[in-house]
Amino acid sequence: MLEPDEVVRPKIDPKETSIILFPGQGTQYVGMASKLMRFPEARRIFDLANEVLGYDLLKLCLEGPVDKLNRTEHAQHAVMVSSLAALEQLKEERPKAIDTCVATAGFSLGEITALVFAGVLPFDKALKLVQIRANAMQVACDRVAGGMAMVLYGPDTEIGAACAKAVQWCVDKGIENPYCGVSNYMFPHCKVVGGNIEAIEFLEKNSKALKIRRIKRLPVSGAFHTPLMEDAIEPFAKALKKIPLQEPIIRVYSNVDGKPYRHVPHILKQLPKQIVRPVKWEQTMHQMYERQQGLDFPRTFECGPGKGLVQILEKVNAKAANTALSIEA
């Protein structure tokens, strides 16, 4: 009689597989995508985007102006399309990385890019969806002045208590229904905090007393992934429901809980929540790279502007980051 471990099974060497990550808003910069223009397919992605959107996105990416590029309704398109264009570079230079990809995830907006890559969303429909998401979020931004800041802190810092003090300060100033809380879980001792602009200013001015080692404001126009974005959920969810989604061909991890989507109804339920819930990126990295001791890690490729996600991976899982590479837009 055969022992269970004697049964012949297919074996895929983890080293021969890949994980592809996509960045989010805040990574945009004037001059982005210039390095990708030598790849015809990358240029074609921009041509398609220009056609769907009705304006010259590539020109905005290459030439700015920066204040226009940083506006939510432009930044989200710029980052998503640049990321998909960077994917074309990866396909050209390392086709095996695409063919052997077993999982994908994207930070905030990047999750929609990941869903396009995984075959869930058609590119043109995703562009329209991002337009609705961005416009709805911009309306929420215009309604309440909000901001976000990256916070580095030590083991003796209580981020929750610091945010509570910021909220109380806003209440004392007469601000209606203020909010301040964690909007992104980045890596150990680093989070992004979002809330009313006055709350962020309070944290900046009182960082020493609150035992915050460093605080850096992010170039975004609102408090994303906080309840201040509540008004953006309904238009986004309504638009998402109208799109005929396909089942993902590889695992796609959700920002909301750091776990893979199970099926299309799960995507329809979770993705709108992402607008008001913290991005659990640190938790996602733990889930994606969890494996038995001694097993090799897959290659990781970050496609899009900047090298931020690979740098985060280095702090969450240094061994997994050893074989990580940024394909920069």
Q: Which functions belong to the PLM regions below?
A:
Residues 277-295:
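A short, acidic, amphipathic alpha-helical segment used as a generic capping/interface helix at domain edges
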Residues 2-171, 299-329:
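FabD-like malonyl-/acyl-CoA
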Residues 266, 270, 279-283, 308, ...:
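Short amphipathic alpha-helical segments
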Residues 75-77, 223, 282:
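Glycine-rich phosphate/pyrophosphate-binding beta-alpha loops
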Residues 212, 295-297:
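Short, high-confidence coil segments that cap the C-terminus of an alpha-helix
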